[in-house]
Curated annotation (Swiss-Prot):
The keyword Phosphoprotein does not apply. This is 3,9-dihydroxypterocarpan 6A-monooxygenase. The keyword Heme applies. It comes from Glycine max. One of its GO terms (biological process) is defense response. The gene is CYP93A1. GO terms for cellular component: membrane. Optimum pH is 7.4. Its EC number is 1.14.14.93.
Length: 509
């Protein structure tokens, strides 16, 4: 019986593909490699798709069409093409694709619950407004400055103690702890590290969720394979979501009990964090958008993945580049010593006076963008750059490839922060206004966490440079630059270093 069902599905797919081919052969479609029956171009795409898209674009042009299984796709690989899709045709390409098995499973069987993946509509607009006003506005960034400072000091103190003892550290793991604690305190008013087991679990969960969301799942593209779960995704998704539920359900339950007691005693909470705001909406019958527990948990998942993984990975890539380019590292250290000195640690207010450090961060984001692919979907058919783009076409803007385009970047594969400095000032904003440099995307669906990343990444990178020399364990003094799959751009291998204290910001240690 299963064989008969599979045979019917295969025949149906071939017939559908033929009808689609006949229909589209009359249109002016983008150039495309030769496709295979049923799988289309899936055989050309590895688990790290942005690299394969880049290689294909060198042969087929800046805008090319691919069929990933039964899903029609278009890949934009230059700044000019990105601008057409993300600015000229922004409204038509404001939706996210809806077939992602991992996202749907992690988001409690509704992709709409995850703000980052929700369709462009009332819920997405409401959640973005909530995120920007209650968590990431300038007012909230200022209010949470002491939190970021405290967590940075704890991070440096922890690494400093290991350095004094001559212990090696997993650089990325330490950064994940730092980012996790910052996001947790901003969102939940508590550190995940207040409970060591919970901290370790949350770090693993954030990494697992980011990896699952970004993995290339063949079932997303060949619909009749979903019941078979050939890659074992469903089991991993359920296991990860169940573990996430255990942690977050406990936090929500504890907060609800605190709120109940405060209400009984008439005690007013001095400051409401993001969880309080979400629970207020959950309890308010007249709220503009009614949030249930699944909405709240999905939003917390969104914030942790976007706020934790992106910042930690960006700092880790920056240090990998600096270790491999010691002249750049030394120049950055000299700038910090000249501007800040050695008697105190760098603060966020110093960053404006450290143009070379800012250039290092920008150059890191050029080569290692937090999101290597901007993924959208067309709401209706359109003509872009002279090509017919049908409705429901999945768009991949290859940010990773755009950062390596020799038409915009001289010697694009070299790490050269100087390219961002002109007349002593940094050039190019990171928020998507310059289409050859869009590390956080562009337009109304620009990553909302860009403002937090720009607060967290430069200052912590500066302090790491200022306080320590870094002695690489193994690797012949060089860090490998291999990537692995994920929704962000994680490193394939950890950076293991011995932090050699250079200045002592903690005289009691």
């Amino acid at each position: 019986m299963a064989y008969q069902v599979l045979l019917i599905c295969l025949v149906s797919t071939i017939v559908f593909a033929y009808i689609l081919w006949r229909k589209q052969s009359k249109k002016n479609l983008p150039p495309s490699p030769k496709a295979l029956p049923i799988i289309g171009h899936l055989h050309l795409v590895s688990p790290i798709p942005h690299q394969d898209f880049y290689k294909l674009s060198t042969r087929h042009g800046p805008i090319m069409q691919l069929f990933l299984g039964s899903v029609p796709c278009v890949v934009a690989s230059t700044a000019e093409a990105a601008k057409e899709f993300l600015k000229t045709h922004e409204i038509n390409f404001s939706n996210r694709p809806g077939q992602n098995v991992a996202v749907k499973g992690l988001a409690y069987d509704s992709q709409d619950f995850l703000f980052a993946f929700a369709p462009f509509g009332p819920y997405w607009k409401f959640m973005k407004k909530l995120c920007m006003s209650e968590l990431l506005s300038g007012r909230m960034m200022d209010q949470f400055l002491p939190v970021r400072q405290q967590e940075t000091k704890r991070f440096i103190s922890r690494v400093f103690r290991k350095g004094v003892a001559g212990e090696a550290v997993d650089f990325g793991d330490e950064l994940m702890t730092l980012s996790n604690n910052i996001v947790s305190r901003m969102t939940l008013s508590q550190k995940t590290s207040e409970n060591d087991n919970q901290a370790e679990e949350m770090k693993k969960l954030v990494s697992n969720i980011a990896e699952l969301m970004g993995k290339f799942n063949v079932s997303d593209f060949i619909w009749y394979l979903k019941p078979f779960d050939l890659q074992g995704f469903n089991r991993k998704i359920k296991e990860t979501r169940d573990r996430f539920d255990v942690v977050v359900d406990g936090i929500i339950k504890q907060r609800q009990e605190e709120r109940r007691k405060n209400k009984e005693t008439g005690t007013a909470k001095q400051f409401k964090d993001m969880l309080d705001v979400l629970l207020d909406m959950h309890e308010d019958e007249n709220a503009e958008i009614k949030l249930d527990k699944k909405n709240i948990k999905a939003f917390i998942m969104d914030i942790f993945v976007a706020g934790t993984d992106t910042s930690a990975v960006s700092i880790e890539w920056a240090m990998a580049e600096l270790i491999n380019n010691p002249d750049v590292l030394e120049k950055a250290r000299q700038e910090i010593d000249a501007v800040v000195g050695k008697s105190r640690m760098v603060e966020e207010s110093d960053i404006a006076n450290l143009p070379y450090l800012q250039a290092i961060v920008r150059e890191t984001l050029r080569l290692h963008p937090g999101g290597p692919l901007v993924v959208r979907e067309s709401s209706k058919s359109a003509v872009v750059c002279g090509y017919d783009i049908p409705a429901k076409t999945r768009l991949f803007v290859n940010v990773w490839a755009i950062g390596r385009d020799p038409n915009h970047w001289e010697k694009p594969f070299e790490f050269r922060p100087e390219r961002f400095i002109r007349d002593g000032q940094n050039q190019l904003d990171v928020r998507g206004q310059h289409y050859h440099f869009i590390p956080f995307g562009s337009g109304r669906r620009t990553c909302p966490g860009a403002s937090l990343a720009w607060q967290v990444v430069p200052v912590n990178l500066a302090i790491i440079i200022q306080c320590f020399q870094w002695k690489l364990v193994g690797g012949n003094g060089k860090v490998d630059m291999e990537e692995k799959s994920g929704i962000t751009l994680p490193r394939a291998n950890p950076i293991i270093c011995v932090p050699v204290p250079r200045i002592n910001p903690f005289p009691t240690i």
